[in-house]
């Protein structure tokens, strides 16, 4: 089914206000969920909203909490999220990293006691739109087996790197081949995954999203490489924030909350003039996209460049929402 941006935001706002969330907080949160969905990231927008409300109802999320700065070391700051709403807190933290970068050339905010930030790419994009390089990542509850194991002991720990090119170039990737949100998107659409995404119950690689969702044997990106990167990202976020690791979140909390996150902004224009920056970025992009194609029907893509088209299509033709997901939201 198709809905407008206003219908989508209105549905989110209604549910949030029914939980006695303050009007300004409900409006800002609903706006972010709707913008994520409008941008084509359904897995962490509309599809994720019922799960967000479940955690809100369970008390994992404290909607009136205010993040507090704990430590300030020039370009580096440490904050405690106080388990406030995840997407609103993450936006504020990247804004703060940008402010620090304006003063120091680089800004790093390490956040502890945070909630799920929904679409991590929103915060990298936020920096790149203002001309900064944006880098951020989060740890999570253990939802992926380390390479060589059957039992979940590491997080998917998504990493975002956004570059202020025209259009913005951005990698937004989980340390698994697919996020659990994308497994859900493919399952709801009745599609197999385009490549192997995990193991079946017999330990064989599989493209069936429902099987992986059920047994939790999701495949690390690049096999042992994604597993290793997940581990070191967790370690850095834990140390810089003095927050909880994947192990602590998993063993000590009843659900995924109290996670640790990193937000970095770099002011490129302090290091290179605008014309040179643009020319160098364009040369990189042209060199890549003019390579001979392996398949004439498959374009060579640069990461993140598809979002401009997805956003335009959704604004022109309406936002696609799965019927079953919309029914869940209407019932909240």
Curated annotation (Swiss-Prot):
<comment type="function">
    <text>Catalyzes the reduction of 2,3-diketo-L-gulonate in the presence of NADH, to form 3-keto-L-gulonate.</text>
</comment>
<feature type="binding site">
    <location>
        <begin position="168"/>
        <end position="174"/>
    </location>
    <ligand>
        <name>NAD(+)</name>
    </ligand>
</feature>
<feature type="binding site">
    <location>
        <begin position="224"/>
        <end position="225"/>
    </location>
    <ligand>
        <name>NAD(+)</name>
    </ligand>
</feature>
<comment type="subunit">
    <text>Homodimer.</text>
</comment>
<feature type="binding site">
    <location>
        <begin position="304"/>
        <end position="306"/>
    </location>
    <ligand>
        <name>NAD(+)</name>
    </ligand>
</feature>
<dbReference type="GO" id="GO:0070403">
    <property type="term" value="F:NAD+ binding"/>
</dbReference>
<feature type="active site" description="Proton donor">
    <location>
        <position position="44"/>
    </location>
</feature>
<dbReference type="InterPro" id="IPR036111">
    <property type="entry name" value="Mal/L-sulfo/L-lacto_DH-like_sf"/>
</dbReference>
<dbReference type="InterPro" id="IPR023689">
    <property type="entry name" value="Diketo_gul_Rdtase"/>
</dbReference>
<dbReference type="Pfam" id="PF02615">
    <property type="entry name" value="Ldh_2"/>
</dbReference>
<dbReference type="InterPro" id="IPR043144">
    <property type="entry name" value="Mal/L-sulf/L-lact_DH-like_ah"/>
</dbReference>
<dbReference type="GO" id="GO:0005737">
    <property type="term" value="C:cytoplasm"/>
</dbReference>
<keyword id="KW-0520">NAD</keyword>
<dbReference type="GO" id="GO:0047559">
    <property type="term" value="F:3-dehydro-L-gulonate 2-dehydrogenase activity"/>
</dbReference>
<keyword id="KW-0560">Oxidoreductase</keyword>
<dbReference type="InterPro" id="IPR043143">
    <property type="entry name" value="Mal/L-sulf/L-lact_DH-like_NADP"/>
</dbReference>
<comment type="similarity">
    <text>Belongs to the LDH2/MDH2 oxidoreductase family. DlgD subfamily.</text>
</comment>
<keyword id="KW-0963">Cytoplasm</keyword>
<dbReference type="InterPro" id="IPR003767">
    <property type="entry name" value="Malate/L-lactate_DH-like"/>
</dbReference>
<protein>
    <recommendedName>
        <fullName>2,3-diketo-L-gulonate reductase</fullName>
        <ecNumber>1.1.1.130</ecNumber>
    </recommendedName>
</protein>
């Amino acid at each position: 089914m198709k809905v407008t941006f206003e219908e989508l935001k209105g549905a989110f706002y209604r549910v949030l206000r029914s939980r006695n969330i303050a009007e300004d907080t409900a409006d800002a949160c609903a706006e972010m969920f709707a913008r994520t969905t409008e941008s084509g990231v359904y897995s962490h927008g509309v599809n994720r909203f019922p799960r967000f409300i479940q955690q809100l109802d369970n008390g994992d999320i404290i909607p009136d909490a205010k993040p507090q700065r704990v430590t300030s070391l020039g370009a580096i700051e440490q904050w405690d999220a106080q388990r406030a709403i995840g997407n609103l807190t993450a936006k504020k933290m990247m804004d703060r990293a940008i402010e620090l970068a304006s003063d120091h050339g680089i800004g790093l905010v390490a956040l502890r006691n945070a909630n799920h930030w929904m679409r991590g790419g929103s915060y990298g994009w936020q920096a790149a739109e203002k001309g900064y390089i944006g880098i951020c990542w989060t740890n999570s509850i253990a939802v992926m087996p380390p390479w060589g194991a059957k039992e979940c002991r590491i997080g998917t720990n998504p990493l975002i790197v956004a570059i202020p090119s025209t259009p913005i170039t951005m990698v937004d990737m989980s340390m698994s081949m697919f996020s659990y949100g994308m497994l859900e998107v493919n399952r709801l659409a009745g599609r197999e995954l385009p490549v192997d995404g995990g193991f079946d119950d017999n330990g064989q690689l599989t493209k069936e999203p429902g099987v992986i969702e059920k047994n939790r044997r999701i495949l690390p990106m690049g096999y042992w490489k994604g597993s290793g990167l997940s581990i070191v990202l967790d370690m850095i976020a834990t140390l810089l924030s003095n927050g909880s690791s994947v192990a602590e979140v998993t063993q000590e909390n009843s659900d995924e909350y109290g996670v640790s996150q990193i937000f970095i902004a770099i002011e490129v224009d302090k290091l290179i003039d605008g014309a040179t920056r643009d020319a160098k970025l364009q040369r990189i992009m042209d060199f890549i996209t003019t390579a001979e194609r392996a398949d004439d029907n498959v374009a060579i893509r640069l990461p993140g460049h598809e979002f401009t088209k997805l956003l335009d299509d959704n604004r022109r033709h309406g936002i696609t929402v799965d019927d079953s997901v919309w029914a869940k939201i209407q019932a909240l």
